[in-house]
Amino acid sequence: KKLGIDLIWICPFYDSPMDDNGYDVRNFFEVSKDFGTLEDFKMILKRAQELNIKIILDFVLNHTSDEHPWFIESRSSIDNNKRDYYIWEQGKIKDGKEVPPTNWGSFFGGSAWEKDEITNMYYMKIFSNKMPDLNWSNAEVRNEMIKVGKWWLDLGVDGFRIDAVSHLDRAPFEDSKNGEGIVLDWHKFSNLPRVHEYLKEMNKELFSKYDVLAIEEV
């Protein structure tokens, strides 16, 4: 307070295997044991409110950890009711060999697809293999993430820094022509039209109901 601080942004502290500094969330409603407990956070939040200091949290919308219960269910079978929570596609045959559904590259290197041996299909992951991308075209996924946001806002946080928000939409699954082999063509999954649609929905169903701050990282 003496430093003139009036807002604190807390990076991901959710339960996580820590493959990517906590951005691989295993449970959105729990605090990682590396950082303490939910009760510890409530104490920090209470003290911050007493000092009139706002607290915002990182909110990861694009993906979860591959250890999240949704993904464990999703990968278990093609008929699971959470299958469409993530982006699954069949591989294709090229020169007599199976290859990923497209030649798109990941921000972290290699393909943007990872084959899962349980159902022999590929899930999309534009970051780490351990961070499967959520399927934002699925209304159930959007509703689930709105519930997550509501839970934290009801707890008393003052808003969110929304991580990697420009990547929530996907182009049709066709090979990039911007190079040979695996191609990091971010136009295939960044700044696409439905991102704005999803954010308008989130504003209507979540943010507009609270006096909070939402900062989108693009």
Describe every region a protein language model picked out.
Residues 1-150, 154, 167-218:
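Acidic/aromatic-lined carbohydrate-recognition and catalytic surfaces
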